[in-house]
Amino acid sequence: MQQEEDDYFQSEEFLDILGRYEQAASSGHTPYMDSDELVDVADYYMSQGKHQEATEATRLALELHPDAQDPVTMMADILFETQQWKDSILWLNRVLDNDPFDVQAWLNLADAQIQCDQFAEALDSAEYTLAIQPDNLHALLQKAYATSRQDRYQEASEIFAQYIERCPDDELALYHAAFNLCFLERFHEANDMLTRAEELSQGLSPEHLNICLQRSYTEARIGHMQEALDALERSKEFQDPYTKVDYNLLSGHVYLLFQHRDKALECFTKALANAEDHLHTMRTIAQVFMDCQDFLTASDILREIEEMAQRPEYEDTRAEAIKAICPAQAYCYYQTGHKDEFLHYLQMAIALNPKDTQIFFRDIFPKEARVEDYLYYANGLE
C-alpha cells in the first residue's frame, strides 16, 4: 500500500496535479480542482511532514466541494496525526456520521478520546469497533485501558488477559495490565508482567521508564527492597528533569514501605525542590503516606496544602487544589478516628468532588448508597 502511494506521488499524473496546485497557490490564485485531486495533494504533503500545507489543501477541498466526504476524512486524519485531539474528535464524528462502519475512524476516535480523558466515550467507540470486527486487537486493548481508567479494575484485568493471551509479547499491554493489577493489590502477578515487559523492551519501548518505575513499586510491595532499588537505578538513564521528580517520589515510596523514614523524607525533599507544581507534588507525597498506612502524616500534609492554597500565588489553582484534597482528607480523618473533622471534610468532598469521594468510600458505605447520601451513613458510624 505504501509503495503504491509512493509510486503514485512520482507519477506524471500526480506531478501534473501538484504542479497545477502549487503554481496557482504561488501566484495567489485559488485553483479550481476536483475534490479527489486536492485530497491527493494534501495526502502528499502529509507524507512529507508538511502539515500546514496539507491543511490548506484540505480546507480548499472542503470549500469547493462541501458535499464531498474525502476531504472530511482527510481533515480528521490530519488533526489526528498532529495530535489535535479535541478537534479530531469533532471531525472523526463527522466521518462516522457518513460511514458508521469505518473501523479506522472508530479506532482513531477511541484513541483521541483516551487522550482527552473521555474514557466512557472511548469505551463506547472501542465497543463499536468490536461489534464490526470482533477480532480487532487494537480495539480490545482500548477497551481494557478505558475500562481500567473508569476504576473497573477487575473487569479490566479480564480484558487485558484476553489481549495478552493473543499478544504475549506486547510490552505496552503488559505494563498497563500490571498497572491495573496494582489497584487490585495483585502485586506478584503485576511484578511478573513488568519483569517480562522490561525484558521485551530492552530500553527501546516508549514506556521503558515507566516500566522500570512501576516495577520498582511492585518489587517493594512484595518485599524485595534491593530489587526495587535496582529497578530505580535502571530507570536513571531514561530520565529528564520532569521524570526526576517521579523518580524521587517513587524512591521515597520504596524507602517508606521498608520503614526507612529518614531516607524517604530526603527523597521527598528532592522531589519538591525540582517540582514545578508544588501542590500537586505534595498531594502525591500525601498519597504515598496513605498507601503506607500513615494517615496522620498524610493528613498533616493535606492540611499544609490547604493552607498554602490560600496564598495569593495559588489563586488560579486554589479551587482545584481544595477539590482534590477533600476526599483524601476525609478518608484520613476517618482512619484516625477524628469524627468531627471527618464529617466536615466528607461534606465538602461530597459537594466538590463526588467522583473521588466514591472511590475512597465505596468499600466503607453500602454499595447501593448514593454519594450524596454518604453523610447520612457517616453519622451512623461508631
What spans do the regions from the language model cover?
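Start-of-helix register in tetratricopeptide repeats
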Residues: 36, 70, 104, 138, ...
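Canonical positions in the second alpha-helix
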Residues: 61, 94-95, 128-129, 162-163, ...
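Short coil turns that delineate tetratricopeptide repeat
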Residues: 66, 100, 134, 168, ...
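Canonical tetratricopeptide repeat
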Residues: 74, 108, 142, 176, ...
